Swiss-Prot record:
GO cellular component terms, semicolon-separated: cytoplasm; membrane
Biological or metabolic pathway of the protein: Nucleotide-sugar biosynthesis; UDP-N-acetyl-alpha-D-glucosamine biosynthesis; N-acetyl-alpha-D-glucosamine 1-phosphate from alpha-D-glucosamine 6-phosphate (route II): step 2/2; Nucleotide-sugar biosynthesis; UDP-N-acetyl-alpha-D-glucosamine biosynthesis; UDP-N-acetyl-alpha-D-glucosamine from N-acetyl-alpha-D-glucosamine 1-phosphate: step 1/1; Bacterial outer membrane biogenesis; LPS lipid A biosynthesis
Single biological process term from Gene Ontology: peptidoglycan biosynthetic process
InterPro entries linked: Bifunctional_GlmU, GlmU-like, GlmU_C_LbH, Hexapep, Hexapep_transf_CS, NTP_transferase_dom, Nucleotide-diphossugar_trans, Trimer_LpxA-like_sf
Segments of this protein annotated with the region N-acetyltransferase: 251-451
Disulfide feature: none
Protein name according to UniProt: Bifunctional protein GlmU
Keyword annotations from UniProtKB, A to Z: Acyltransferase, Cell shape, Cell wall biogenesis/degradation, Cytoplasm, Magnesium, Metal-binding, Multifunctional enzyme, Nucleotidyltransferase, Peptidoglycan synthesis, Repeat, Transferase
PROSITE patterns in the cross-refs: HEXAPEP_TRANSFERASES
Length: 451
């Protein structure tokens, strides 16, 4: 049986009070629409259609060709939004899942279970429900004396008694596709908001003695919609808690989960320790037995095993096993550190390969460079890589020693076992096994201040 999905993402989100389209706000390092689309696709969907309106181009740019798109010019309600997908799905057979684009906490497992329940019961429609402590704003699930669904009533149309019901509609549904588009033609806007409600499709199915099921989730957080900045913060908090708990169950020690921010796509190996105030984001991969020190930020980077990082910023970099980083080091895009490399305090590395065993202990800038194995770069040493127009490369061979306060003016190559005297400004290549000294001879005038 074919499975389709429609993601509703046409609302402007005025309560967010933002120039940014609502579903493009981030939760746990990814936009809400990406979270929803990823989980929908992973639930076994063959075809995804996203309904766009305000900010359509931005949504298309975010999801790319992973989805088809239908445009809703006027926002006339959820049934009207779903109807826009008829250009892609009206002739299709099978099951169609309808999900709101502002529900980033919905899981693949719940969506799979919803669809399976729907298909196993040969239902024409199934609604995902939950129990809310505060159901205000949600449609209420109305059942008869035998517990069967009677209808879903929206907040503004509910009586006082109906508003006391705490079983709510999530706004997530599974439908028989042909029945869905047949009934959408019959939906009217006779309600307080003069909108075309998708839940009215369920009432129309029931009128024809069709089968409508309710699938209940015990986790209200999953179906929580995000309509303003407060709810965005709540979603972030819930997502962070979920992510951190999963890592801890997988063998990662997180000292203070409340202050630890780990993105949804980050992977961490067993017995790694994450200290308070750490932020790990993007597609970062952390190995085993590594210590990520407090207030470290790692983005889209690969960190090996048995690495120690103290209070540093690492972005789009690679760090091999047994390396030590920081405190207060910065690895910028293109930094590639080999095994047992040391990058100390106030060292910045950009677009450079630092080979195994090399040491950059403190106060250095290494840019557009290649540092050989076991080479030591002294305090205050700089690769002078930019002439105001172009960047140039510095190459330092293996087992070399760069004295303190040295300037290496690129393009330049220092051979293996080079020895550069402290305080030198080196502008010419240095052959291997050579000493280079480029500084003025010291002049001392004794008794000068007594004159």
């Amino acid at each position: 049986m074919q499975r389709h999905a429609i993601v509703l993402a046409a609302g402007k989100g005025t309560r967010m009070k933002s120039k940014k389209y609502k579903v493009l706000h981030d939760v746990a390092g990814k936009t809400m629409i990406e979270h929803v689309a990823d989980n929908v696709k992973q639930s076994g969907i063959d075809q995804l259609v996203t309904i766009v309106g305000h900010g359509a181009d931005s949504v298309k740019e975010t999801l790319g060709d992973t989805s088809l798109y239908s445009f809703q010019e006027e926002q006339l309600g959820t049934a009207h939004a779903v109807k826009m997908a008829s250009e892609h799905l009206s002739e299709s057979q099978g099951t169609t899942l309808v999900v709101c684009g502002d529900t980033p906490l919905i899981t693949t497992a719940t969506l799979k279970s919803l669809v399976e329940h729907h298909e196993n019961n040969q239902a024409h429609a199934t609604v995902l429900s939950a129990t809310a402590e505060n159901p205000f704003g949600y449609g209420r699930i109305l059942r008869d004396s035998e517990g069967r669904l009677v209808s879903i009533v929206e907040q503004k149309d509910a009586t006082d008694a109906e508003q006391q019901i705490n079983e709510i509609s999530s706004g997530i549904f599974a439908f028989d596709n042909q029945v869905l588009f047949e009934k959408l033609e019959l939906v009217k806007n006779d309600n307080a908001q003069s909108e075309y409600y998708l839940p009215d499709v369920l009432s129309l199915i029931l009128e024809d003695r069709g089968i409508v099921e309710v699938f209940h989730t015990n986790d209200f957080e999953e179906i929580m919609g995000v309509n303003d900045r407060v709810m965005l913060s709540e979603a972030e908090k819930a997502f962070r808690k979920r992510i951190n708990e999963q890592h801890m169950k997988n063998g990662v020690t997180i000292i203070d989960p409340v202050t630890t921010y780990i993105g949804a796509d980050v992977r961490i190996g067993e017995d790694t320790v994450v200290e308070p105030g750490v932020k790990l984001s993007g597609n970062s991969v952390i190995g085993e037995d590594t210590v990520i020190g407090q207030h470290t930020e790692i983005t889209n980077s690969k960190i090996g095993s048995n690495v120690t990082i103290k209070q540093s910023v690492i972005n789009e970099a690679i760090v091999d096993d047994y390396a030590t980083i920081g405190p207060f080091a910065q690895l910028r895009p293109g930094a590639d550190l080999g095994k047992k490399v040391k990058v100390g305090n106030f060292v910045e590395v950009k677009k450079s390969v630092v080979k195994a065993g090399a040491k950059l202990p403190h106060l250095s800038y290494i840019g557009d460079a290649e540092i050989g194995e076991r080479t030591n770069v002294g305090c205050g040493s700089i690769t002078v890589n930019y002439d105001g127009i172009n960047k140039f490369k510095t190459v330092i061979g293996d087992d070399s020693f760069i004295g303190c306060n040295t300037n290496l003016v690129a393009p330049i190559t220092l051979g293996n076992r080079s020895f550069i005297a402290a305080g030198s400004t080196i502008t010419d290549n240095v052959p291997e096994d050579s000493l280079a000294l480029a500084r003025a001879r010291q002049t001392t005038k004794e008794g000068y201040l007594k004159k």
